[in-house]
Amino acid sequence: MDIISVALKRHSTKAFDASKKLTAEEAEKIKTLLQYSPSSTNSQPWHFIVASTEEGKARVAKSAAGTYVFNERKMLDASHVVVFCAKTAMDDAWLERVVDQEEADGRFNTPEAKAANHKGRTYFADMHRVDLKDDDQWMAKQVYLNVGNFLLGVGAMGLDAVPIEGFDAAILDEEFGLKEKGFTSLVVVPVGHHSVEDFNATLPKSRLPLSTIVTEC
């Protein structure tokens, strides 16, 4: 299946078949999608909670109580539920961790190359955390890059998913102690196979025309 076919076929799943689970291979592949998403300067300012047990999904679904109860069944019935979390502040230790991993993965031929890479990434990090003072927003944008990459990727795997912002982040952050770890939850994405109750699966896709959204020059 080519990438355009995937983009045209995938949809936001409104109901999941609780009896259909991801295979062990598929479960590993969705984690690989999370790991290899692009991010600005390869900063990777994220963490993910992958819930696949009934207990784990129930913990995530606590955030769908009250106002967001309409999203509860999606979280409980999906095979897996991924919580996308962003760092709340960029720190030097994280930048060092990234460049050290790049070195371990063989991306630098010389110490000077490593130093130059680290200097460049730190420049952009400082632009946001020192000058613009919007590093939390900058890092959230990187997580959304991951969400988009993930949705297209699981679609290419023949799986169904839905991005959810309708949840109580404060409840979810507390449930998993995210604030203490320097993260906050941004998006919840249930993954699995849609059920016959998924009305959105049979509706035609609707998008604004290219003439409205694209300027060519």
Curated annotation (Swiss-Prot):
Which processes are annotated in GO (biological process)?
Answer: 2,4,6-trinitrotoluene catabolic process
> What keywords are annotated for this sequence in UniProt?
Flavoprotein, FMN, NAD, NADP, Oxidoreductase
Give binding positions for NAD(+): 14, 41, 67, 71, 74, 107
According to the UniProt record, what class of enzyme is this? oxidoreductase
InterPro entries assigned to the protein according to its UniProt record, in alphabetical order:
NfsB-like, Nitroreductase, Nitroreductase-like, Nitroreductase/BluB
Query: What's an example GO cellular component term for this entry?
Result: cytosol
Task: Locate the residues binding FMN.
Answer: 10-14, 71, 165-166, 205-207
Q: Which residues form a coiled coil?
A: none
* Cofactor(s), by name: FMN
Q: How does it assemble?
A: Homodimer.
Its family remark reads: Belongs to the nitroreductase family.
The further comment given in this record reads: The nitroreductase might be involved in the quinone metabolism.
Instruction: Please identify the protein, giving its name as recorded.
Output: Oxygen-insensitive NAD(P)H nitroreductase
Origin species: Enterobacter cloacae
Gene encoding the protein = nfsB
